[in-house]
Amino acid sequence: VNEIAPRVHNSGHLTINAYNISQFENIPFDTLNEINKLKKVLPKPSVNRLIQHRLAEKDFINKLNIRTTRYVSIEKKSDIETLEDFLPGILKTTTMGYDGKGQFPIQKIEDVNSLNIDFSKGYILEKLVKLKKEISVIVTRFGVNSFEIYEPIENNHEEQILKQSKIPAEISEKILGQSLEWSKRIAEELKYIGTLCVE
């Protein structure tokens, strides 16, 4: 831990303007867990492990009665051959995917044969849906019943990579209210301490 995160030992002291802060969700769970033994990590390492796994993350969200696109776990190539009703869809690695990486658009069963997919990894197949737009809601939770929820942000992508975000998002009052309520529900259920972005 000392070699990986030398700043851990300084984190218990009040420090102003000393370090840059960056956002990256793919920090190994074991690394965060070791740091957590020395200095409390917030949000909890278990939260980071959950959001790093697309299948576990979607299972969690659906248990909160928040709808996602239809999805199914894929362990081997032959699994897809029985799932024609999920197509067109997007096959995604369950871990380490971001900015379009680890994603394979599949229009029909035959497409699987033409794609270079390593089935030794875990995958999730998501039913393709036509999105009108993507929004993000940022929630900062300090503790039980202590949080701030910020105005939704509208995101525009090019080739699956975020290019622009704008405020205010052009959304209905219904979508506004629902997005704020869902974001709060997720943060509360996770017992999240810190700042969370829900897309």
Task: Please describe what each predicted stretch is.
Residues V41-P43, T69, I90, I124-E126, ...:
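Structural detector of well-ordered beta-strand residues that form the stable sheet scaffold
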Residues N17-E25, F29, I51, L55, ...:
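Electropositive phosphate-/nucleotide-binding environments in soluble metabolic enzymes
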Residues V1, I106-V198:
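Internal nucleotide-binding/catalytic subdomain
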Residues A5-I27, K37, Q178-V198:
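Active-site "cap" helix and flanking loop/linker of ATP-utilizing ligase/carboxylase catalytic domains
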